[in-house]
Amino acid sequence: NPKINDFVASNPSFTNLHPLQPAESMQGALEVYYKTAKYLAEITGMDEFTLNPYAGAHGELVGLMIMKEYHYRRGDYKRTKVIVPDSAHGTNPASVNVAGMEVLEVASNPDGTVNIEDLKAVLSDEVAGIMLTNPNTLGIFEKDILAIKELARQYGALLYYDGANLNALLGITRPGDMGFDIVHLNLHKTFSTPHGGGGPGSGPVGVKKELAELLPNPRVVYEDGKYQIKYLPTAIGQISNFFGNFLVVLRAYTYILTLGKENLKYVGKLAVLNANYIKESLKDYYQVAVPGLCKHEVVFSGLKSKAVSTLDVAKRLLDYGYHPPTIYFPLIVHEALMVEPPETESKEILDGFIETMKTIAKEAIENPELLKTAPHNTVVRRLDEATAARKPILKYQDIINN
């Protein structure tokens, strides 16, 4: 999270605004909204964007609502199914269910890419769309994306892009150029906004022009030499209070302007370089889930020494001062450990992480119990996560009573 983002976002000219002010008195904020939407459209190859969703999963739901409404207005009421790969992020099928549609799971190849034959078997005139992440959750580019696009067109389905892995594509290609009709982004994944703590977040949704009228209200437009707020009757409705999380959008806008068009194109290349540097450095210690070139993230399938689990490795990383990477996802990878270095990490930082991972691999062989009882240097040691998940204590009074 670049400090310049927080410097701009803490400016009283922005923090003292109220969304019920007259539009004439907040032209600067409306300009940020308008231009951020235009920048995101250019970056992704979409035609229009809404910045109103509060987070990535919220954006997912909005995109699916647009998909559903598009078919409904065409009188195509039987399109109630959405195809989701078995390697997808868990929010994909969850969002489909919340949107009132049915999930059709399609099998993946060993590298996580969509099995085309399996896809053909589930396509029909009841399918509303296909949800894909590209690169997929194993960090592998969906090489058959153009063939998938043609199949979607053939059956009248829309193509939906989960933007969680957009980092790998910046400056190289765009979802719109691959044939995607709807895109949702996670500003914390690609545009340097705060990542943790449960929010606030932002999950902008972009669409091709055929779907633009469905984007939720309110809209920010530029007409008659000024920025205006409009509520269009063709929209799917209003999906958030006012304009979403403005200060998060402002941080992303700052990041885009700071890098500029010339430097944004290096984001994808550096993210891919960093991930492959880690993969090549650790492949003799940890099993690589998919051999060969990965994109912005590398997925390992546990240690080559089987004495300890991926969970043990993650817990031991805490002792060395590292926040553990994602573990046990994707679900189709046994003992998965996903490392996703951003484009901003220096070689020195990457080398420090690599050496720590090598040290842990050696500890697993020489003293596996050290890992199985980790962490040792944190205030709270290993938690009983299974009980915590099954019997959560969510109220302070329950803690007192126990």
Report each predicted region and the residues it spans:
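Short, flexible loop/turn elements at secondary-structure junctions
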Residues: 55, 136, 165, 189, ...
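Non-catalytic terminal extensions of PLP-dependent enzymes
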Residues: 1-47, 65, 223, 228, ...
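General small-molecule cofactor/ligand-binding pocket signal
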Residues: 50, 104-106, 325
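Cysteine-centered functional microenvironments
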Residues: 18-21, 53, 133
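Catalytic-loop motifs flanking and including active-site residues across diverse enzymes
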Residues: 59, 199, 244-251, 294
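Conserved PLP-enzyme active-site core in the AAT-like
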Residues: 28-31, 58-226, 234, 308, ...
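A short glycine/serine-rich beta->alpha loop
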Residues: 46-54, 190-192, 235-241
